[in-house]
Amino acid sequence: MANMSVQLVAVERRLWSGEATAVVAQTTEGEIGILSGHEPVLGQLVEGGVVKITTPEKETVTAAVHGGFLSVTADGVSVLAESAELADEIDVAQAREDVKRGDEQARARALSRLRAAGHSS
């Protein structure tokens, strides 16, 4: 499978950058899977979504993303999130607490963080 260049960037920092074989993200139009050679597209990311990047070594980089855009060009894929966290950085206990006591937007973010960290609730 051919590789493509992928950037995962949030307003506050670059979370991940490198070669990948696939990217899956949730947009306002539905879930989209991107492979090398995909047609150019610009999609709006959903609030409280999860992005999964598959590396050439078959490792999966997972992140909780909150708003932003996904851009696919001939040069690669850019995920530009308003905010994002890598799955291995998520405090699962805190996210569960946020689900219990948060308002609707805080709950959506917390649920996204739990999904990215591999916990359904």
Swiss-Prot record:
> What InterPro entries does the database record attribute to this sequence?
ATP_synth_F1_dsu/esu, ATP_synth_F1_dsu/esu_N, ATPsynth_dsu/esu_N
MF-aspect GO terms: ATP binding; proton-transporting ATP synthase activity, rotational mechanism
Protein's membrane topology: Peripheral membrane protein
Superkingdom: Bacteria
Subcellular location per the Swiss-Prot or TrEMBL entry:
Cell membrane
Positions the record marks as coiled coil are none
GO CC annotation: plasma membrane; proton-transporting ATP synthase complex
Alphabetized, the UniProt keywords read: ATP synthesis, Cell membrane, CF(1), Hydrogen ion transport, Ion transport, Membrane, Transport
Subunit-level organization: F-type ATPases have 2 components, CF(1) - the catalytic core - and CF(0) - the membrane proton channel. CF(1) has five subunits: alpha(3), beta(3), gamma(1), delta(1), epsilon(1). CF(0) has three main subunits: a, b and c.
The family classification in the record reads: Belongs to the ATPase epsilon chain family.
Query: HAMAP family per the record?
Result: ATP_synth_epsil_bac
Question: What does this chain do?
Answer: Produces ATP from ADP in the presence of a proton gradient across the membrane.
Record PANTHER family: ATP SYNTHASE DELTA/EPSILON CHAIN, ATP SYNTHASE EPSILON CHAIN, CHLOROPLASTIC
Please give the name of this protein.
Answer: ATP synthase epsilon chain
Q: Which organism is it from?
A: Saccharopolyspora erythraea (strain ATCC 11635 / DSM 40517 / JCM 4748 / NBRC 13426 / NCIMB 8594 / NRRL 2338)
